[in-house]
C-alpha cells in the first residue's frame, strides 16, 4: 500500500479519512472511461507487485507469534550449552570480530565469568525451551555501555532482532538508569544487524575501526 501511495495509485481510491461526496466519486468513475488512463493506472499498480506478498504475510505472522510467546530473562547456569551452540553458529562466528570456533572449555570459562561480572548484563530469549537469541550489554566508563546481539539460525529472517533489541534496551534502562549512552559495533558487511540497530533508533557514529560501523 505504501508503494502504491508513493506512485499515486491508491490516493484517490482508498482514502478512508476523506469526506467523500457523490460528485467526487462520479469524477473518479468517469476517468476510467478513458482507455489511456486505465492503462496508466494499471501500469502504476503492477509496477509495485513482486509476487512476494504471501511470503511477507507469512513472515509477519511468524514474527508476531514469537513476539507474543517469547520470554526474556538474565542468563543463568542452565543457559551454558544453548549459548555455546549459538556462539558457534556459522553466521554468528562470521559476524563476530573474533571468527575462530569457540571450544567448550573456552566458552565455559567465559560464561561463568560473565555471570559474575557486575559490569555485564546478558539477556536470553526463549520460546518455550528453545533459545531464540541473546542481547549483551558491557558497561564501560563514563556511564556508557556496548550492546551486541545474536539470533539462532531458525529464527532469522523474521525481523525478530528489533523485538529483542527493544525488549533488552527497555529492561536494561530500567535497571541501569545511570547509563546515558549505548554503542553498538557492527561489521560493515553485516547488513541485517545494521538495519536492526537503525530501526531500534541507533544512528551512525564515527568509528576508529575500519572494519566496523559504530552506532549510538
Model-derived segments and spans:
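Nucleotide-activated sugar donor-binding and catalytic core shared by glycosyltransferases
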Residues: 1-66
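Structural signal for short hydrophobic segments within the conserved structured cores
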Residues: 11-15, 73, 121-123
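Acidic/polar helix N-cap motif
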Residues: 21, 34, 76-79, 89, ...
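A generic secondary-structure signal
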Residues: 31, 113, 171-175
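Acyl-donor (CoA/ACP) binding surface of acyl/acetyltransferases
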Residues: 69-75, 80-82, 86-87, 128-216
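Hydrophobic alpha-helical core bundles mediating ligand binding, dimerization, or RNAP-core interactions
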Residues: 83-88, 107, 111
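Conserved GNAT-fold acetyl-CoA-binding loop/helix
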Residues: 91-109
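A short helix-loop-beta-strand connector motif used in the catalytic cores of GNAT acetyltransferases and
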Residues: 112-124, 133
